[in-house]
């Protein structure tokens, strides 16, 4: 895959990979992982699309300098600018977890108008369900804003998120899940800048339900696919059903025997649904 860089007007950078030719299809990974979340489906999709795989800010090789605000509004601005630059004015977009929230926020703000949108398991308008480990990691990152604690806590965060976590994210114990998590945190230990920036983001990201998104769904006047996992405890099917009821042009597909790492648990199914929906 080709590695490229996008530079936002405020200097923030997005590192992204491209594979294939055809209409651009951007796939936005979940919080805490990287573009590698989509590796199992890239080969299949690249026969039909120019697959665009960014590392979102604070992830991978993308922006992590603490000079930026890292508010939801800032994330949506950078994301919208990137998609406009890399994929054009009406991109095909797939988004998972927190990236799905950012995509809907960008649409509500009028800065993103996708031709088609695929929303994969996410809390969306509901209060996020976090495991004890995730709550611990969030507390560690919030504390990194204290001067002198950033480098120490970056090591603590890397130790708290072990590769074995990948086993809990995949219901099929998919090969590669541990490597995915290992790659996602390999640059965290000792990275004081990233720790401080994560602390900003953790402090400024809403911790409760985001009910304002309920007003955005009826305004999404383009085709939307809710591609859901049947065994992701943090993102039950009821979330997708609530969204479906409010969409003017929505459809729901549920993949059996899939968990949080939906593209690892059923890469064939995910690729099939994306091709069928995005054309």
Predicted feature residues:
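Catalytic active-site module of serine/aspartate enzymes centered on a nucleophile-bearing elbow/loop
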Residues: 250-279
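Active-site loop/oxyanion-hole signature of alpha/beta-hydrolase fold enzymes
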Residues: 53-98, 130, 272
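Short beta-strand/loop motif that positions the catalytic acidic residue
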Residues: 220, 226-228
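Hydrolases whose catalytic domains are alpha/beta-hydrolase-1, hotdog thioesterase
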Residues: 102-106
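Flexible "cap/lid" loop of the alpha/beta hydrolase fold
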Residues: 108, 115-149
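Conserved alpha/beta-hydrolase "acid-adjacent" motif
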Residues: 233-239
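Conserved alpha/beta-hydrolase catalytic His-Asp/Glu region
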Residues: 119, 128, 151-219
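Conserved HGGG/HGGXW glycine-rich cap/lid loop of the alpha/beta-hydrolase fold
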Residues: 12-61
């Amino acid at each position: 895959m080709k590695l490229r860089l996008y530079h936002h007007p405020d200097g923030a950078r997005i590192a992204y990979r491209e594979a294939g030719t055809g209409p651009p299809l951007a796939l936005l990974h979940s919080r805490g992982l990287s573009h590698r979340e989509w590796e199992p489906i890239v080969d299949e999709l690249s026969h039909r699309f120019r697959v665009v795989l960014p590392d979102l800010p604070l992830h991978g090789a993308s922006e992590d300098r603490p000079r930026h605000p890292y508010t939801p509004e800032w994330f949506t601005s950078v994301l919208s600018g990137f998609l406009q630059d890399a994929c054009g004015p009406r991109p095909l977009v797939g988004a998972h977890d927190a990236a799905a929230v950012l995509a809907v926020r960008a649409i509500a703000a009028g800065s993103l108008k996708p031709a088609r949108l695929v929303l994969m398991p996410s809390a969306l308008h509901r209060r996020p369900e976090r495991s004890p480990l995730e709550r611990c990691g969030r507390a560690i990152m919030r504390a990194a804003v204290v001067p002198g604690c950033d480098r120490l806590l970056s090591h603590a965060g890397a130790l708290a998120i072990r590769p074995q976590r990948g086993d809990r994210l995949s219901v099929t114990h998919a090969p590669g899940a541990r490597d995915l998590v290992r790659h996602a945190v390999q640059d965290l230990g000792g990275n004081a800048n990233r720790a401080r920036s994560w602390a900003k983001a953790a402090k400024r990201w809403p911790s409760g339900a985001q009910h304002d998104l309920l007003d955005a769904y009826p305004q999404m006047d383009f085709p939307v696919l809710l591609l859901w996992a049947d065994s992701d405890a943090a993102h039950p099917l009821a979330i997708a059903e609530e969204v479906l009821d409010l969409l003017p042009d929505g459809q729901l597909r549920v993949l059996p025997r899939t968990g949080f790492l939906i593209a690892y648990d059923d890469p064939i199914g995910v690729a099939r649904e994306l091709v069928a929906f995005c054309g």
